[in-house]
A protein has these predicted regions:
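Surface/interface-facing alpha-helical segments and adjacent flexible terminal/loop regions used
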Residues: 1-158
Length: 158
């Protein structure tokens, strides 16, 4: 029989050496309701990280939409792949809808994440436009589109 202290030591070392096996064992312990043997410290950290990963994914999709919308509006080059930018926007919009459908509480993060995403999007759009020979110096200081416009499947910037 595994003692509580032995289980704690095994859990911690397993967490560091074989995460998948650690996770499977934690799930089994939860299923068996053997809560006293759980690696609570790492389990709490992992559960918290799960929520963070979904927020990060949401911000990343918003950033992609903003980058390509900025490029659609500000690109003056004749070599720009507008169709690819639009496809990327459509894919990111679908991904956001799936995230919100699966995790409705994420919708509360759209506004604050969009503000942060815009900062990174302007930096990335500037770099990417330079790759196409567009030397655009600056973008609006705040996002020129509403959240509804960013995620609506029929909206395209002009």
């Amino acid at each position: 029989m595994i003692t509580k202290q032995q289980g704690e030591v095994d859990n911690v070392s397993l967490y560091e050496t074989d995460f998948v096996k650690w996770a499977e064992e934690q799930a089994a312990l939860l299923t068996e309701r053997r809560f006293d043997l759980l690696d609570l410290e790492n389990l709490i950290e992992e559960v918290d990280d799960l929520a963070g990963r979904h927020r990060d994914a949401l911000q990343s999709h918003l950033r992609v939409i903003m980058i390509h919308m900025l490029k659609l509006v500000y690109s003056t080059g004749s070599r720009n792949p507008e169709h690819a930018w639009k496809r990327s926007i459509r894919n990111a919009r679908k991904a956001i809808r799936r995230l919100i459908d699966n995790y409705p509480s994420l919708s509360a993060y759209l506004e604050p994440l969009s503000e942060r995403a815009y900062k990174y999007a302007t930096e990335d759009a500037h770099d990417e436009l330079s790759d196409y020979g567009d030397d655009h110096e600056s973008f609006p200081t705040s996002c020129p589109w509403t959240l509804d416009e960013l995620v609506h499947h029929e909206f395209w910037p002009r």
